């Protein structure tokens, strides 16, 4: 009985919640009021409130679902409100009277409209072990035990019982924590036990949803549950003693969240697009719309039903479509869909849960746009029964007439595009009709020339169709056929020769003035009185003339079949015929003269030059004949030698091989090398035959054993012509002139060099040499030198020191050079001598100085040097007074030096 009572207590909240949801849904449909549905929200809490602990959930009624509401707390330091209305603790604090009441505000983000509701928190009474023992109204779950078969005492059973799941409705309004069940062990009479639960929702994320009193074992839920987030919780209950030792095996507790109708259906698309052909029969499928509901699909809360709320436009019937209330398939239910009248329908589709219950179910809407597609239910119709046009004769690819049609189908579709055909009046296919892709007009075009003299008018029967056949039951009206009357305009046409070309046969050799034929043209314009005149357009050999009035053709020169203007025995001449119409027209005709051959060309020998040996053997000359005539005025030919001069037949003999070839051989045993002209008589087979004496130029030469001319004979025989000799002489003369000019230039250069030479011996002229000497430091070996040549600066007269400027050393001065006195020798230059002696002594005593006493090698200065070696150079102490007069003979470049050291009293 206790368990039954507990089960009833569990079901009562569920039934109450269902009843409350039904009432709320009914009230919402009847009259929805935006704001908080409750005046005061209350919750029962423990004394200690922890940071982040969910306290309660406040609901806000948003009737149209479009408001965006923001929540605020009047005590923001202690409480905060999430977007879903869940109230959390901002910090940890003990619950007291000052926290018992506060306000929650809801404000519309767009309109700034504001609502408020009061929240009341009450302190849950503290449970003691005595109060727990006295509490017997809450359903208990006892850890299972059973009797032993042997002892009859209570023992643990080997297998746990299966605890029935706890059903808890979602969105419960509390107060929280809400007691669910009490877990108890029958060993609590002897031991002090502590109870705990583990699993998702307790100590695993999301934590804190379920809590248990460790002393009483009371299991509670701390906040409203949401089945759409978690539909089932699986917890495990544990019982331990005060030392933490396990007293009972853990038992499984399953908590099922009972679904509430708290979610409206949502369409996958807010706007659905579909098409249906016009003229569709009832029952034609159009499209499918789909909505989903987050509630339990196996319960009424998630079972959706569809219906059409409205249709726009409502023609021809307000109920043109219907929808399957379970699948969302939209089909046609009425006939009369006509795209030309209504091109698009807009349906408002509603999806309602609770199997479409309008009282308790939640609804949502979407839009279905149905486009009526075109079919070929309107044939093209001509705007007129007869169309007119005209065309000049002999003109093609011109538009004669425009055929216009109307079609009510959708433009630029196969059901609208027109196709024209000619059904009568054009047996020879001279006309065609093309469709203008933009205007859909038919363009009647002439494709073959029309002769006015043959047909002056055409009456065409044309029909218009579409690219696709008409829909079933639609027939072509009479307006789909029309007549086109085409008038042909006469124009001046070109005269024409008949036949063209005209062929005549004539023998060559006709004399000038011979009338060959009459070549006339015809005027196709029979209804115009016009005259034709003739002129010659092309006559390559200028053999013909034509009468401008009657067209008679006469020769003005002898016709020759062998002329280069004759190809394959045919001579072509072109003539022009012109009328006097407006505008004047002309035509050309070709006269082909087939020339018959006569024997008017004598044969000639081929080749005209040949070679043979001085002896008859082993060579012979093969010859043939060239005749510009053709059979029978050509071969076979007869070959013979003339009687004079007598040396021809004495030296040569000719043998006829066949009708075209003969062989020429030496008759005598030896003929001196040279060039001989042998006349040969050749006669053709014409009637009468024609003969000719042709000269064969034969070169007789010395031959080798093979019968070939030797190279010596070829070179001698070749010789040099006058032009070659003149060219060789000119080359020799030019070469001699170049050599002579080179010799003259060399002579002139030598003279210039001699004019520039100095008066001194060339061997002593070393002015142009820049001599580099090796290192000569360390002092001279020859220290016996005359220091009298060194002059102190104070011995020079002040007047002699004058600035003369800077000039080139090879420049000849144009004014008198200053004269300097001859330096007097200083007999005892003590200062310079002491300086040199001190330096010499220091060098001799320096142990780090290099051994300059060794043999020193100097560069060779050439044979032009006055001193053959350095040892032959004279110093100031080697002799008496030095003679520097020879410096005056060295030219202007040494004049400065000669003036300084030359003899002179001053």
From Swiss-Prot:
It is a single-pass type I membrane protein. Pfam families: CADH_Y-type_LIR, Cadherin, Cadherin_pro. The chain crosses the membrane at residues 725-745. The keyword Protein biosynthesis does not apply. Residues 160-267, 268-382, 383-497, 498-603, 604-714 form the Cadherin domain. Changing residue 597 to N: In ACOGS; decreased function in cell-cell adhesion. GO terms for biological process: adherens junction organization; blood vessel morphogenesis; brain morphogenesis; calcium-dependent cell-cell adhesion via plasma membrane cell adhesion molecules; cell adhesion; cell migration; cell morphogenesis; cell-cell adhesion. It is found in: Cell membrane; Cell membrane, Sarcolemma; Cell junction; Cell surface. Cleaved by MMP24. Ectodomain cleavage leads to the generation of a soluble 90 kDa N-terminal soluble fragment and a 45 kDa membrane-bound C-terminal fragment 1 (CTF1), which is further cleaved by gamma-secretase into a 35 kDa. Cleavage in neural stem cells by MMP24 affects CDH2-mediated anchorage of neural stem cells to ependymocytes in the adult subependymal zone, leading to modulate neural stem cell quiescence. It comes from the Eukaryota. Residues 26-159 form a propeptide. Changing residue 407 to N: In ARVD14; uncertain significance. GO terms for cellular component: adherens junction; apical part of cell; apical plasma membrane; apicolateral plasma membrane; basolateral plasma membrane; catenin complex; cell junction; cell surface. Keywords: Calcium, Cardiomyopathy, Cell adhesion, Cell junction, Cell membrane, Cleavage on pair of basic residues, Disease variant, Glycoprotein, Intellectual disability, Membrane, Metal-binding, Phosphoprotein, Repeat, Signal, Transmembrane, Transmembrane helix. Ca(2+) 1 binds at residues 170, 226, 228, 262. Ca(2+) 2 binds at residues 170, 228, 259-260, 262, 295. Homodimer (via extracellular region). Can also form heterodimers with other cadherins (via extracellular region). Dimerization occurs in trans, i.e. with a cadherin chain from another cell. Interacts with CDCP1. Interacts with PCDH8; this complex may also include TAOK2. The interaction with PCDH8 may lead to internalization through TAOK2/p38 MAPK pathway. Identified in a complex containing FGFR4, NCAM1, CDH2, PLCG1, FRS2, SRC, SHC1, GAP43 and CTTN. May interact with OBSCN (via protein kinase domain 2). Interacts with FBXO45. It is linked to Arrhythmogenic right ventricular dysplasia, familial, 14: A congenital heart disease characterized by infiltration of adipose and fibrous tissue into the right ventricle and loss of myocardial cells, resulting in ventricular and supraventricular arrhythmias. Agenesis of corpus callosum, cardiac, ocular, and genital syndrome: An autosomal dominant, syndromic neurodevelopmental disorder characterized by global developmental delay and/or intellectual disability, corpus callosum agenesis or hypoplasia, mirror movements, dysmorphic features, and ocular, cardiac, and genital anomalies. Three calcium ions are usually bound at the interface of each cadherin domain and rigidify the connections, imparting a strong curvature to the full-length ectodomain. Calcium-binding sites are occupied sequentially in the order of site 3, then site 2 and site 1. This is Cadherin-2.
